[in-house]
UniProtKB/Swiss-Prot annotation:
Classification lineage: Bacteria, Pseudomonadati, Chlorobiota, Chlorobiia, Chlorobiales
PANTHER family: LIGHT-INDEPENDENT PROTOCHLOROPHYLLIDE REDUCTASE IRON-SULFUR ATP-BINDING PROTEIN
Species per Swiss-Prot/TrEMBL record: Chlorobaculum tepidum (strain ATCC 49652 / DSM 12025 / NBRC 103806 / TLS)
GO biological-process terms attached to the record: nitrogen fixation
Keywords: 4Fe-4S, ADP-ribosylation, ATP-binding, Iron, Iron-sulfur, Metal-binding, Nitrogen fixation, Nucleotide-binding, Oxidoreductase
Gene: nifH
Signal peptide: none
Entry similarity comment: Belongs to the NifH/BchL/ChlL family.
Protein name as catalogued: Nitrogenase iron protein
Catalytic reaction(s) noted: N2 + 8 reduced [2Fe-2S]-[ferredoxin] + 16 ATP + 16 H2O = H2 + 8 oxidized [2Fe-2S]-[ferredoxin] + 2 NH4(+) + 16 ADP + 16 phosphate + 6 H(+)
EC numbers for this chain: 1.18.6.1
Cofactor binding mode and count: Binds 1 [4Fe-4S] cluster per dimer.
Length: 274
């Protein structure tokens, strides 16, 4: 079972990219579990046809310790197994702590056991690695390979570099490695070349460039992944290609984060700052 975590700046399209990629893997016959690690609990909605599933933390709050696995895992598109960690009530408690509680409970209830014959587990993780809870998948060895969703926008690249610092910090203890950058295009000038160069400087690869297409939003409005909504659309092939590249990936590295002035010089070199 491969353990994958998807990180990236808030709003960059991690949940959308994760679910569309998982749909590509599921279509290819892989058995996948998706663990949403975001208080918004939107990491599995498209795989479940728009169903806002009850989160692990909500279930614990309402039912106490008497929780069964089927209470917190739902079957989605092509038998994907979907669960959402959820978060505390707004203004109370720590969302990162909630992820730790949820993942530990999933382990106790046997969600990762061999009987499920999982090929992959994907963790879709909120925003930047800013606190220990959100770093938990990489800190505790829950995830072994990380993919960072980014774009040619400065803050997305800044966040990607920060996440690489987190991976570097925990690489020895948790054994986690960076599998590559996924460029979720925002149609920035020279975007592909810039992210390829960022990847090169970090010591990794741009594993795929996902072109911007409003069809992704249309599929979302219909509560589906692109592959589920219209398997013949060119954008569906982009996610199939990304899924195939992840499935065949052999490049796993400890990244070399950039200094902030190196990052700024990259932006200047490729024309954003001009």
């Amino acid at each position: 079972m491969r353990k994958v975590a998807i990180y990236g700046k808030g709003g960059i399209g991690k949940s959308t990219t994760t679910q569309n990629t998982v749909a590509g893997l599921a279509e290819a016959g892989k058995k996948v579990m998706v663990v949403g690690c975001d208080p918004k609990a939107d990491s599995t909605r498209l795989l479940l046809g728009g169903l806002q599933q009850k989160t692990v933390l909500d279930t614990l709050r309402e039912e106490g310790e008497e929780v069964e696995l089927e209470d917190i895992i739902k079957e989605g598109y092509r038998n994907t197994r979907c669960t959402e960690s959820g978060g505390p009530e707004p203004g109370v408690g720590c969302a990162g702590r909630g992820i730790i509680t949820s993942v530990n409970l999933l382990e106790q209830l046997g969600a990762y056991d061999d009987e499920w014959e999982l090929d992959y587990v994907f963790y879709d993780v909120l925003g930047d690695v800013v606190c220990g809870g959100f770093a938990m998948p990489i800190r505790d060895g829950k995830a072994e390979e990380i993919y960072i969703v980014c774009s040619g926008e400065m803050m997305a690249m800044y966040a990607a570099n920060n996440i690489c610092k987190g991976i570097l910090k925990y690489a020895d203890a948790g054994g986690v490695r960076l599998g590559g950058l996924i460029c979720n295009s925002r149609k920035v000038d020279n975007e592909r070349e810039m992210i390829e160069e960022l990847a090169r400087r970090l010591g990794t690869q741009m594993i795929h460039f996902v072109p911007r297409d409003n069809f992704v939003q249309r599929a979302e409005i219909n509560r589906k992944t692109v592959i589920d909504f219209d398997p013949t659309h060119p954008q569906a092939d982009e996610y199939r290609a990304l899924a195939k590249k992840i499935d065949e990936n052999k490049m796993f590295v400890i990244p070399k984060p950039l200094e902030i002035d190196e990052l700024e010089s990259l932006l200047i070199e490729f024309g954003i700052a001009n």
